[in-house]
């Protein structure tokens, strides 16, 4: 595939959910599919950036083929923790007609409930940091591990964290 723009060489650290999703829209419905903010941030960014670093956690039920897909997009998964005896985070939601609003139908935290992000040393000086949809205390732990202030920090959140972990 030929790119319209040249990929930048800056490093990007992406921390967030690598998960399973089940999604309903007015146009269709999926069962359990590979999802998660960090998954899709990584895949989208891979078209514009050469160096992508991922920190997340999955259970032993997460498909190796999905991890290979990340590798195929030059995503370094040295920071991906795999907890073999546990289940991967799962989210289910229904999107409304305008596709801007949605209702959460189910959230199973699973491995995310005890996720302690460990930023590998080689990731700690990344130029950009994308903190995906995670509990704010986990996002703060990532910030505390950065050895160099990123040029840009992007933060995502969701009503679940605000409703349950506002402290």
What does each model-found stretch correspond to?
Residues 8-13:
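Extreme N-terminal starter segment of soluble prokaryotic enzymes
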Residues 28-43:
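Short catalytic helix/loop segments, enriched in acidic residues and glycine
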Residues 21-32, 49-130, 144-150:
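Conserved N-terminal subdomain of the carbohydrate kinase-like
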Residues 128-167:
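Conserved beta-alpha-beta core of the PfkB/ribokinase-like small-molecule kinase fold
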Residues 39-53:
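A short, N-terminal amphipathic alpha-helix
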Residues 17-18:
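Active-site metal-binding loops of divalent metal-dependent hydrolases
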């Amino acid at each position: 595939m030929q790119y319209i723009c040249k990929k930048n060489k800056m490093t990007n650290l992406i921390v967030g959910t690598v998960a399973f999703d089940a999604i309903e829209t007015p146009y269709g419905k999926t069962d359990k599919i590979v999802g998660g903010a960090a998954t899709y941030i990584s895949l989208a960014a891979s078209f514009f950036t050469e160096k992508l670093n991922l920190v997340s956690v999955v259970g032993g039920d997460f498909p190796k083929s999905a991890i290979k897909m990340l590798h195929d997009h030059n995503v370094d998964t040295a920071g991906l923790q795999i907890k073999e005896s546990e289940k991967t985070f799962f989210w289910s939601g229904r999107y409304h007609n305008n596709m801007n609003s949605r209702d959460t139908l189910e959230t199973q935290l699973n491995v995310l409930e005890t996720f302690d992000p460990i930023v590998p040393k080689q990731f700690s000086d990344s130029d950009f940091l994308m903190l995906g949809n995670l509990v704010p205390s986990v996002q703060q732990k990532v910030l505390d591990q950065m050895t160099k202030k990123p040029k840009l920090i992007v933060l995502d959140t969701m009503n679940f964290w605000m409703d349950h972990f506002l402290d």
